[in-house]
Amino acid sequence: MTNEKIEKVHRFLEEHGISHKTHYHPPLPTIELALEYWKEIDSTHCKNLFFPNHKGNRHYLVVFECHKELSIHTLEKSLKQGKLSFASPERMERCLGLLPGSVSPFGLINDMNLVAEDGTPNEGVAAKELFENGHRVKLFLDKDLQEAELVSFHPCDNTASTVISNADLMKFLGLWGGEYEWIEIE
């Protein structure tokens, strides 16, 4: 049985010349469970959190090294984006095509091509949710990840972890075309 979400990620990466290696494992919805399976995977493993702002019209994906702790209050201050809360499963599905426990930058392939050539939002896309660049999501990455040679994320499903080089992550983000920013996460 094939997993459509994982296959979609693999297809996108391969179509764009992004090298990757995927490791399959039981569902790992939390970092605590994942650490046991990640021991044999040579990469920097990441934690990925998805937040809407207090109005629900802006969405932020925050990616950082999995051993770090994140204070939402500190994040709110540093991002200057207002009050943040964890996204509901419905919002995750709508914006990233993901379910809780599977949040990943690879979900950004579902944050592409949201507007028509004339700039109007495609069907099912609310204009109020779009940033000026035509994407629903702004990405914040931990500055320390710039030093990682390899990084790993769930390929839109928590039954696998996909490893790519940092250079290929940057290529992926360029293909996505949305806004991202490097931030300090203690």
Where in this protein do the model-derived segments appear?
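Extended, low-hydrophobicity, polar/charged segments
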Residues: 1-186
